[in-house]
A protein has these predicted regions:
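Short phosphate-engaging motifs
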Residues: 1, 27, 144
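Residues at secondary-structure transition points
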Residues: 22, 46, 50, 110, ...
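PLP-dependent aminotransferase-like
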Residues: 7-98, 105
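Short, conserved loop/helix-junction motifs that constitute active-site signature segments
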Residues: 86-87, 113-115
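Active-site region of PLP-dependent enzymes
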Residues: 101-108, 115-172
Length: 172
């Protein structure tokens, strides 16, 4: 689901994506698979979240997105809303990798995974809900949701037809 999220946000060659240095390999691989550059940033040892100040200092003109990873339902001690506002001001997309945080909340009672442009949840074997190798993406951006639905179904234009006018993969 992380690769689909990155595809939906238009990440590709020449782009740079900031990723915390404490995450599962699927996070940086989803960026590398699309030909973008991964820039690892240190985490805060107390929360295991990316260090927001170090992430801000790592942003360059090529930075297109940042992955926020919540390990085991932990949340940042810093204000995530201010950090996301900062990303928006720099036109940087935010993907929340909430694979291990289904059902967890931020301090303001918003579910982890619902504050960025896209939230990603995993349903693989060791997770809270397991479907084998499934997952889910969430967004409250209708245009982005439509892109995601097309990408995960071979680029099909919708409605079960055989019109494939958009790049996509088999990830139903």
């Amino acid at each position: 689901s992380l690769t689909i999220a990155a595809l939906a946000l238009g990440i590709g060659p020449g782009d740079e994506v900031i990723v915390p240095n404490y995450t599962m390999v699927a996070t940086p691989n989803s960026v590398r698979l699309l030909g973008a550059k991964v820039k690892f940033v240190d985490i805060c040892p107390k929360t295991l979240w990316i260090d927001f100040q170090k992430a801000k200092k790592s942003i360059t003109k090529d930075t297109k997105a940042i992955f926020l990873v919540s390990a085991n339902g932990r949340y940042p001690s810093e204000n995530i809303d201010k950090f996301i506002d900062y990303c928006i001001s720099k036109n940087i997309k935010v993907i929340e990798d909430a694979a291990q945080s289904l059902g967890s909340y931020y301090q303001d009672n918003v579910h982890i995974g619902l504050k960025g442009n896209i939230g990603s949840f995993s349903f693989s074997a060791p997770k809270i809900i397991s479907t084998g190798q499934g997952g889910a993406l969430v967004t409250n951006d209708d245009e982005l949701a439509f892109k995601i639905s097309r990408i995960k179904d071979f680029g099909r234009s919708g409605g079960g037809n055989d019109t494939h006018d958009y790049f996509g993969i088999n990830s139903k």
